[in-house]
Amino acid sequence: MRPIVALALMLVLLSVGCGKKGDPRAPELATPRVIQNLTATQTPDGVALTWSRPTEYVDGRALTDLVSFAIFRKEISPTCVDCPVPYRPLTTVNVEDQERFVRQKQYRYVDEEVQDKMTYRYRVSSQLRDGSLSEPSNEVEITRGP
């Protein structure tokens, strides 16, 4: 009796197959469009960064799972302007209006941890719900004056 049940089960599994028949498809590219309008301005409190929220993936579909923006900074030493310095994560700005009908279009962050006479470079990446990051934005540079 057991061999008959096992054989019947195997026949059922073989007849069902595994998935839809057809040509294989490459996974969809679900990366947000790159932020291209990052700006940096000096304020009394530090350096203000502003940028626009991306609304689409690179393939043109509407962006639906944006959760935050990752801000990266590097400090350029006045004594070694050409030294290779890596970008370091500075902070994360959360997107809290994903379920709202009208979403925020512009974002702003003020970096208060800056020193006078230092040069800083910044870039921003969009972060999706799965933790993946977009390509970095345009790079902005600012020298903090006294």
Regions found by a protein language model. Name each.
Residues 1-7:
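Bacterial N-terminal signal peptides that target proteins for export
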Residues 9-12:
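Processing junctions and N-termini across compartments
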Residues 14-17:
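C-terminal motif of bacterial Sec signal peptides marking the signal peptidase cleavage site
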Residues 19-65, 116, 131-146:
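Pro/Thr/Ser/Gly-rich low-complexity, intrinsically disordered linker/stalk tracts
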Residues 52-53, 63-117, 132-136:
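Recognizes extended acidic, P/S/T-rich segments that occur
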Residues 126-130:
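Surface-exposed loop/turn motifs at beta-strand-loop junctions within extracellular Ig-like
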